[in-house]
UniProtKB/Swiss-Prot annotation:
Entry coiled-coil feature ranges: none
Residues given in the record as NAD(+) binding sites: 18-29
UniProt-listed SUPFAM superfamilies: 6-phosphogluconate dehydrogenase C-terminal domain-like, NAD(P)-binding Rossmann-fold domains
GO CC field: cytosol
Protein name: Altronate oxidoreductase
UniProtKB keywords: NAD, Oxidoreductase
PANTHER family, alphabetized: ALTRONATE OXIDOREDUCTASE-RELATED, MANNITOL-1-PHOSPHATE 5-DEHYDROGENASE
Superkingdom of the source species: Bacteria
Record lineage: Bacteria, Pseudomonadati, Pseudomonadota, Gammaproteobacteria, Enterobacterales
Length: 483
């Protein structure tokens, strides 16, 4: 069986116009996949050079396959049908290591056609590294590497204003473009680079903040033999992802036309402020996950897919989204409804086995950031506690017993919470404290919740009622009235 390469698998190739920091699965199934579609359907005509930003030889370089690889996009489509689509990606030209080929890295700035910089260097990537110097070959941090490359660009083209870049980071931090810009300016100042360069940074370059959303499951290790037999070639860089994707870019409208989104619309939004879209994702997608996990797991289920195929649990989650989360969010209702519909479809994806226990990681913090704002807003708007979000808090409290049907399971959270729950549940089982005492102790920790939740009218009482129902009837019976 032949391995992918451009000689044996000839096809379109594109001039290099995009620099991409990061060689991982996510960018290849998200950015490079979208660029490939735009190349096919518009005159974007943009090839990608991947820059490996870390000193590592694993995985091997994508250049071993001449930049070619296959994405397999699978999940439920808009009609709820299971679909699987294999696509040979031709948008990537090559990969270079900034550690092994530093001069080649700097030469990227000499190409007059270079226009875009994308990156995903993990959440820790957009950070300051003390000691990074201009003459390092390379500097350690991504922002320092980018600063050096931008200075090379500025110098090569004598500060021409039409030779700046549109810089679009995809790292999962708030306002990632603004954070990256601040660090580039910090290094420029620290390295005593000219005021003219700093002015060029500001006038010629656009730093965009983003929200990225797609579950990328990467290399399908357990299915490789079957998939390669279907494809008819060997691909060491197979990349699988869900059908859904969303790319929100905070930036000027010209970004849409430069990416040719006006000629072939993808699920990419160019917006003035990313904040409401982040709130939507956190509240609906992440919030539904967080509400679902303790309820579904204690009902005897193990994966998100199993939960969404369970009539009662699915109804509980959907009612939480549509009746309690969406009404308190500040975005057009049709956008929220459309996003919510996509979320429930994503949860039902038969190709993704999403373990509930893995999502349960750091559940206390997740509840505070993802559900509590909607719970409190719902009470303020209607004067009534949202029944399902409140029940989810009771279910979370029960989850931290660490036992299901007589078997223990691992709890992954801050040591403080694990120890505190262990103490409280022991006292409860020994009859030393009541259920209400236990609930009061959990809700009173204002250092965690940001306020003392025992002061929220009726919350202690309702969580206690729900928790008692879970303890006496079991999760299935306790949740039924809310389904």
């Amino acid at each position: 069986m032949k391995t992918l390469n451009r000689r044996d698998f000839p096809g379109a190739s594109y001039p290099e116009r995009i620099i991409q920091f990061g060689e991982g699965n996510f960018l290849r199934a998200f950015v490079d996949w979208q660029v490939d579609l735009l190349n096919e359907h518009t005159d974007l005509n943009a090839g990608v050079v991947i820059v490996r930003p870390i000193e590592s030889t694993f995985p091997p370089s994508l250049s071993t396959q001449d930049g070619l690889y296959t994405t397999i996009i699978r999940g439920l489509n808009e009609k709820g049908e299971a679909v699987s689509d294999a696509r040979l990606i031709r948008s990537v030209n090559r990969e270079i290591s900034v550690y092994d080929n530093y001069d080649e890295f700097l030469k990227l700035a000499h190409n007059p056609d270079m226009r875009f910089v994308f990156s995903n260097t993990t959440e820790a990537g957009i950070s300051y590294h003390a000691g990074d110097a201009f003459d390092d070959a390379p500097a350690v941090s991504y922002p320092a590497k980018l600063t050096r490359l931008l200075f090379e660009r500025y110098t090569c083209f004598d500060g021409a204003l039409d030779k700046g870049w549109i810089i679009i980071p995809c790292e999962l931090i708030d306002y990632n473009g603004e954070a990256l810009r601040e660090l580039v300016l910090r290094y420029a100042q620290e390295w005593n680079l000219s005021a003219a360069f700093v002015q060029w940074l500001d006038q010629a370059n656009t730093f965009c903040s983003t929200l990225v959303d797609r579950i990328v499951t990467g290399y399908p290790r357990d299915e490789v033999t079957q998939l390669e037999a279907e494809l008819g070639y060997h691909d060491a860089f197979l990349d699988t992802a869900e059908h859904f994707y969303l790319f929100v870019i905070q930036g000027p409208k010209k970004v849409a036309s430069e990416l040719r989104l006006d000629k072939y619309p993808l699920n990419v939004l160019i917006v003035d402020d990313i904040k409401p879209y982040k709130e939507r994702k956190v509240a609906i997608l992440n919030g539904a996950h967080t509400a679902l996990v303790p309820v579904a797991f204690q009902a005897g289920l193990d994966t998100v897919g199993e939960a969404m195929n369970d009539r009662d649990i699915c109804a509980f989650v959907e009612k939480a989204i549509y009746e309690e989360i969406i009404p308190v969010l500040d975005l057009p209702r049709d956008e929220l409804m459309s996003f919510a519909s996509a979320v429930t479809g994503r949860f039902q994806n038969p190709y993704i086995k999403h373990q509930l226990l893995s999502i349960a990681l750091n559940g206390m913090t997740k509840f505070r950031t993802r559900i509590l704002p909607q719970l409190l807003a719902g009470q303020q708007v209607s004067g009534v506690l949202p029944a399902r979000l409140t029940f989810a808090l009771a279910a979370l409290t029960a989850f931290y017993r660490g036992e299901r049907r007589g078997e223990t399971y691992p709890l992954q959270d801050d040591a403080h919470w694990i120890e505190r729950y262990q103490q409280l549940w022991h006292q409860h089982s020994d009859g030393l404290i009541s259920t209400q005492d236990l609930v009061h102790a959990v809700l009173a920790v204002d250092a965690h919740w940001g306020q003392n939740l025992t002061h929220v009218a009726g919350l202690v009482e309702q969580v206690t009622t729900d928790l008692d129902a879970i303890l006496t009837k079991g999760m299935r019976e306790a949740v039924k009235p809310l389904c």
